C-alpha cells in the first residue's frame, strides 16, 4: 500500500530511538534520570480532581459536547482579566483545543494555502513545523541563537520575505530555549506584523514559569495586538493536567471562526467533564501555580548551577520548564551526545536537532524531577567522566 506523501514531510522519530535505548537499559536494571519529556511531576490540585469526579457522575456529561460550554468561554475571558489584566477578550474570541499541540498542528489546515509563507522560530517546538507543512505552507526560519539571546529579531527578516509571509509563530517563554520576552520586544513583533499584514500566532503555554522576579503576560498586553494576533493559552503545565489536553486559542474573531469551522469537521468537542475541570482551574486559586514557579526556579538553579560546578558551562534558563545546554566538546552531533549520556550516566535529555537545524549543537533538559534527584543526576554526569 502506498501511504500519504505527506508523511515524507516529517523526519525520523528521534524520540523513538531514545526510548529504545531507555527500554534496553531499564531491562538491564539500570537506574535512569529522565529529563527529556516536559511532563510535570506535580499532582493536580484536589479541587480539580473533585470537579472531574462530580462531572462524571452526571450521565448527560458522557454525550457529545458539540461545542464549548458558554461558562467555560466566559471563564477564559475572566481569567485573562484576572491573570493578565486583559479585559478586551469576549467569548466569541475564544475556542478550545485538545492541547496546544492539537491546535497548532491543525492551524495550517484552517489558515494556509499551498505556497503560503510561514515564519517559524528555529529552534522551535516540532509541531510548529508539522502544522505549517500539513497546511501546504512553506516555512521560513528566523534564527534563535546565542548571539541574539535566543530571541526573535524581526530586523533579520528580509523585506521580500516579510511581504510574502502570512503567519508568524512566536513562543515566549520559549520551548526549547528558555528565553523570555519583554514589553519592548513584543511591541517590535506586533508592529512588524501589523506593517506587513501578518497574523501573529503566540504560543503562551509557559507564561506562569518565568524566573528571577520577571512576570509573564499575554500578547494582548501589547497595544495593537488585538488587530493582528491570536494566542494559544494552555492549562497543561500550569495546573499539571497534561493528559487532560486543555488549551484555548484566543484572539481575532475571524481566525477563531475559521478554526472552529475546521474543528467541527474533525471532532465533536472537548469531553464535558474536562470542560468542567477547565472551569474549576480558570476560576480557582492561583497560589499553587505561583509556588510551583518557585520550585521550577530552584530546579533550574540546581541543574544549571550544578552542571557549571562540574565544568559544563550551561547558562541559566530565564523561563519555561526547560534548560538549553550546549553540547560539550568532542561530540559531532547532539544525538551522539544524548546516547552517550544515557549510556554512561543514565541521564536522558533531548537532542537539539529534533527542534530544527539551529538546534544542533545543543540538548534540552526538562525540569521534571525534584531538586534532590536533579542533584543525583548531576553527580551521575560527573562520575561518568563524559565531560572529559
Regions found by a protein language model. Give the residues of each.
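N-terminal small-domain helix-loop-helix segment of the aminotransferase-like
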Residues: 2-4, 8-99, 106, 281-284, ...
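Conserved core segment of the aminotransferase class I/II
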Residues: 222, 226-297, 301, 305-306, ...
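Active-site phosphate-binding strand-loop segment of PLP-dependent enzymes
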Residues: 145-213
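Conserved glycine-rich beta-strand-loop-beta hairpin in the small C-terminal domain of fold type I
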Residues: 279, 295-304, 314-326, 359
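PLP-dependent aminotransferase-like
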Residues: 91, 109-170, 183
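A short helix->loop->beta-strand "cap" motif at the edges of active sites that frequently abuts
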Residues: 116, 137, 195-199, 226-227
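Helix C-cap/helix->beta junction micro-motif
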Residues: 25, 135, 195-196, 310, ...
